[in-house]
Amino acid sequence: MIKIRKLTKHVGPERIPLLRGIDAEIHQGEFIAIVGPSGSGKTTLLRCLALHESWEEGSLIVGGNDVLKSGWTGKMKLKREWAYLEQNPHLNMNRTALKNVLIGRSGQTPWWRMVTGMVRSDDYMGAMDVLEDLGLLDKAHDKCDKLSGGERQRVATARALVHGAKVILADEPVNGLDPASASHVLETFRKLCSDERVTIITVLPLEMAERFASRIWGLNEGELVFDIQGRRLTQAEKNKL
């Protein structure tokens, strides 16, 4: 279980609040969508959970251990097991989808593999299996500059899974995608949660959150204003955003 306790973050000399005492518990295999207006703290919360940003108060507890009190090794373990997918995935556009998946992210892959691109045969087969699971087997040998935005998002997801991600934090993964591509990405996420017990926390438009997520967090002005099971929101809940 993952516990977020009183997570609070301010910015600037005037200490403008970005996150206001966020409290939540997350269970394995949940597909959580964060919704809210622009500037409500959605991306900031994701980046804090990924340890890409710090916070002033509160704690992130994973498996009973406070991450910030677990030292360098604890933080590195989390960064290996948690993947942060930005809106525009950092892929090498001159390499194939398969190579991007195999080489992985810095911090997860030995330096010699990052430089040479050399891989073991079992790694190759594992990557091909994941690409097949995500509907990308026919794109494995295509360079990433030839792929659509939705396909690139799935390549980034495959890369995270091949390198051991148990939690995926995805910042607006369907922004700019056509409806069919967006649905394909989110169906992939939902399948990973239900079949592989991967935990996914992502920022989504409200209508997509209602369709695909198993749980919805509503943020407004840095405050968690509701935490509900995935369904259509009531008008009263929408009014909180």
Enumerate the predicted regions with their spans:
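Conserved ABC ATPase signature
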Residues: K143-L147, E151
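Conserved ABC transporter NBD signature motif
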Residues: G58-K69
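ABC ATPase NBD coupling module
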Residues: V67-A83, R120
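Conserved ABC ATPase "signature" region
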Residues: M114-K139
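Catalytic Walker B motif of ABC-type/P-loop ATPase nucleotide-binding domains
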Residues: I168-D171
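Helix N-cap at the start of a conserved alpha-helix in ABC-type nucleotide-binding domains
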Residues: P179-S181
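Helix-to-loop junction immediately C-terminal to a conserved catalytic motif
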Residues: A50
